[in-house]
């Protein structure tokens, strides 16, 4: 499969968004999802995308369990700052979310860590400061943020 570059990361041209394995389209079968994840790596997918909010952590747990022993074969993207409780861009919340995601994913580093939503109550500099600190600590390779379509652009 052809590859693309995202910052310093080289990923398969087609990535696997994993949300549907834990939410959004009805109950998914974990055994079938595990087969899908492993088959995706077998055919050349190297970019997997998940988030703490997908299935309230279940999606990250599924990936961690299903692909244990294969971590060197894929680039892992996950997200923080959005949960069933709402948007939270608080630096302490971001740090805790990262620790929880690392445990669920059974890894010591997240390749691309997203702030899932910009918190209108927290200055973006504070949220991105926490993401930068995770990179400094070696818990993330890189970071970015997503925005809502209604977020004003300057």
Model-based region annotation:
Residues 1-74:
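N-terminal binding-site loop/beta-alpha segment at the start of enzyme catalytic domains
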Residues 28-40, 90-103:
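Short, acidic/polar
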Residues 122-125:
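Active-site-adjacent beta->alpha loops and helix N-cap segments on the catalytic face
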Residues 37, 60, 64, 98-102, ...:
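Generic structural signal for well-ordered alpha-helices
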Residues 144-150:
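Conserved small/polar residues in nucleotide/adenosyl-binding loops
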Residues 12-16, 76-78, 113, 143:
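Hydrophobic faces of well-ordered beta-strands that scaffold small-molecule active sites
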Residues 103-120:
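Active-site groove signature of glycoside hydrolases
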Residues 19-21, 51-53, 79-83, 115-118, ...:
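Active-site beta-loop-alpha junctions enriched in small/polar residues
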